[in-house]
Amino acid sequence: MFIKNYSLVVGKKVLLKETELAFEKGKINHILGRNGSGKSQLAKDFLLNGGRNFSSDISSNTLIISSYSNLPRELTINDFHKVIPWKLSKEIYDLLDIKSIDSSIKLKHLSDGQNQKVKLYVLLSLNKDIIILDEITNALDKTTVGEIHLFLQNYIDNHPDKIIINISHDISDIRLLIGNYFVIDNQKLNKVPSSEHAIKWYLGEE
């Protein structure tokens, strides 16, 4: 996916100005940026398309999974199998080991890690072409983060036609998930050659 001369303005604040968006299929495209740089606003703009930068097919084929894309916490996994209008993916069910989670317990009684796995299972089953992950490992324990990393790597390997954009400030996400690396700096989205370059930039070392 390639968008030229992309700008993002929220209110009177210019977050990105005449930059390029170039995200590769079959890769996890990581975006690092400091607070207030526009990471999450960029994700939302894929759907809102406020600047009319995206074609309608891009907006309609984009899925955002984040802290604000929550599932009803009164439901169980069994409930989702009954009420979700789209087909739930057996592949994702297996990759995330959903069977290890009690399917009769309401989401509000599950751990944060279990909730995140169920969210990924249900929402990724929508089978969208562009998947934006916004801080999805935030506040999760180390074991769950490792399991989600493994899942994402397997998922993109199995679906080379999809684009994954991972917005994160978690250094382990950037270091352990192989992909492309971008930083938001001076209102530009700049590609850097490696995870180490991205991390050094984020830590202010270059």
Feature locations, PLM:
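ABC ATPase nucleotide-binding domain signature region
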Residues: 43-86
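Walker B catalytic motif
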Residues: 135-136
